[in-house]
């Protein structure tokens, strides 16, 4: 006869405790995962305007509207102990967007507007954390990054505004300057050129005396990691710019976007004649400049340093290190740009229209 003993109260207690511990551990792990998920801070949590943009990554891809999105190579958030920041990062070499030679991690506005009827505004507060460690010091674009733009979506797709930050190796202070690029007259855009205006520090034209020698450091420049703010407003054809930074003089500028001042070669500034004429960029501008062309804002990190030989273009081709596009090696050796944005805003009028044509034309990886 088989005798079945009832489990002792002690054994039952052990089983219950074991089950309870196992269940508790599982719930604890699930809770940790949930907390971790909740603690992820996205760019759209930091600056609440991302529904108005598409995002181009440093590998040339357009990821669309970047709500609740991050990419640890190019676009994510950081906290510096006081504030959350949106990080834009792009290597010297890799796949690019559209026809550009340069990589970017950059927002592009979903809508476009026309300068003559515009009432648009973009603002941003940022700090540049890194520019390329290498590049030919006689090339004006070397060690620079564009952190804000107005871009044309039509015809030549030129840029009435690019806001630059540039700092040379060994310098404590860098320069902030802005460019106006002409909207070249006619169908041939090869003669296009930029005019550079200093905000703090030097303008674009100040370069090293040789490929491995840097120029003098600017006295009133902006350091890596130092905050500054820009405000860009376009209203009734006039672009107004304001630049602010603690401890620096506030600077303001205006530029007419619908009436050119560069109708003949005699009108072209001396800076441009010295910088661009030697490489064949000596065009003149349409009389009405950017009137009638759809324009839009851009914001982020548009790397101006690349690996192309300076023999191709003495102003824009840096001959910098790219490790054949190996992003990890570029990041490890300082051959990239990194820009942190703390805040930003976008004012959009009721005159805007879809910018989808620009994206459909340029959304390809080279």
What does each model-identified segment do?
Residues 181-228:
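Short, aromatic/His-centered strand-loop micro-motif at the edge of beta-sheets
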Residues 2-12:
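Bacterial N-terminal signal peptides that target proteins for export
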Residues 47, 119-121, 133-137, 221, ...:
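Ligand-recognition surfaces built from glycine- and aromatic
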Residues 75-190, 365:
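Secretory/extracellular carbohydrate-interaction modules
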Residues 122-124, 226-235, 239-243:
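Short tryptophan-centered beta-strand motifs in secreted/extracellular beta-sheet-rich domains
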Residues 12-20:
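Bacterial N-terminal signal peptides
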Residues 20-40:
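Bacterial Sec-dependent N-terminal signal peptides
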Residues 36-69, 355-366:
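Extracellular carbohydrate-recognition regions
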């Amino acid at each position: 006869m088989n005798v079945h003993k009832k489990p002792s109260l002690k054994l039952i207690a052990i089983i219950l405790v074991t089950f309870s511990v196992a269940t508790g551990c599982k719930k604890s792990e699930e809770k940790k995962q949930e907390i971790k998920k909740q603690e992820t801070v996205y760019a759209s949590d930091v600056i609440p305007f991302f529904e108005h943009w598409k995002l181009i990554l440093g590998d040339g891809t357009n990821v669309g509207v970047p709500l609740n999105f991050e990419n640890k190579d190019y676009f994510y958030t950081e906290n510096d102990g006081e504030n959350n920041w949106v990080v834009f990062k792009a290597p010297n070499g890799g796949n690019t967007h559209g026809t550009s030679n340069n990589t970017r991690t950059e927002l592009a506005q979903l809508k476009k507007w026309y300068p003559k009827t515009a009432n648009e505004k973009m603002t941003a507060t940022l700090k540049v954390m890194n520019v390329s460690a290498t590049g030919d010091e006689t090339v004006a674009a070397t060690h620079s990054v564009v952190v804000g733009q107005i871009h044309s979506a039509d015809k030549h797709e030129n840029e009435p505004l690019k806001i630059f930050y540039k700092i040379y190796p060994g310098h404590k202070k860098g320069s902030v300057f802005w460019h106006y690029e002409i909207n070249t007259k006619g169908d041939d855009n090869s003669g296009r050129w930029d005019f550079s205006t200093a905000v703090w520090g030097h303008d674009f034209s100040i370069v090293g005396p040789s490929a491995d020698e840097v120029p003098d450091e600017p006295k009133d420049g902006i350091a890596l990691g130092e905050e500054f703010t820009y405000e860009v407003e376009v209203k009734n054809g006039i672009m107004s710019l304001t630049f602010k930074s603690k401890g620096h003089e506030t600077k303001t500028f205006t530029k007419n976007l619908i009436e050119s001042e560069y109708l003949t070669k005699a009108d072209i500034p001396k800076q441009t004649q010295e910088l661009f004429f030697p490489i064949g960029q000596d065009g003149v501008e349409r009389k009405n400049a950017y009137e009638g062309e759809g324009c839009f804002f851009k914001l982020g990190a548009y790397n101006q340093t690349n690996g192309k030989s300076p023999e191709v273009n003495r102003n824009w081709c840096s001959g910098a290190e790219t490790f054949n596009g190996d992003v990890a090696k570029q990041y490890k050796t300082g051959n990239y740009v990194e820009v942190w944005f703390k805040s930003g805003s976008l004012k959009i009028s009721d005159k805007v229209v879809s910018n989808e044509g620009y994206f459909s034309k340029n959304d390809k990886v080279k």
